[in-house]
């Protein structure tokens, strides 16, 4: 596989707490140029990125970075991100629940978020 073909599988990502709009613009321009799968950006930039780069798949994270937010908070983040133009959601799994063996609760959280995103992409990270 050529590197150009590989790009279509890459989520070009900038998730630092200090990421600026200028950095998001650069990221989006690179993703467009290289035809990457998506850009994964902080939710605070989703609406603006979607307005400036409507041709891109915009991904954002919920429950980031620790995953230990409650399910309702993750659902609220998801709803807002979708309303702002996100086409993909990366959900941070609650590793504490996994370590505790709370698999039914983890499964239910994933199910609820998938229900919320519908036919859009949900990735559990």
Give the label of every model feature segment.
Residues 11, 49, 81, 124:
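Conserved, mostly hydrophobic/aromatic
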Residues 16-20, 25-62, 69:
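Conserved alpha/beta-domain cores
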Residues 24, 74, 78, 106, ...:
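Aromatic/hydrophobic pocket-lining residues that form the small-molecule binding cavity
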């Amino acid at each position: 596989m050529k590197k150009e073909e590989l790009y279509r599988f890459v989520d070009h990502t900038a998730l630092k707490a200090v990421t600026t709009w200028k950095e998001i613009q650069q990221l989006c321009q690179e993703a467009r140029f290289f035809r990457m799968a998506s850009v994964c950006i902080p939710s605070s930039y989703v609406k603006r990125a979607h307005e400036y780069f409507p041709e891109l798949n915009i991904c954002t994270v919920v429950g980031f970075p620790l995953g230990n937010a409650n399910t309702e908070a993750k659902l609220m983040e998801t709803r807002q991100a979708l309303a702002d133009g996100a086409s993909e959601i990366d959900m941070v799994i609650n590793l504490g629940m996994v370590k505790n063996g709370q698999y039914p609760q983890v499964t239910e959280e994933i199910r609820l978020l998938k229900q919320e995103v519908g036919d859009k992409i949900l990735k559990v990270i």
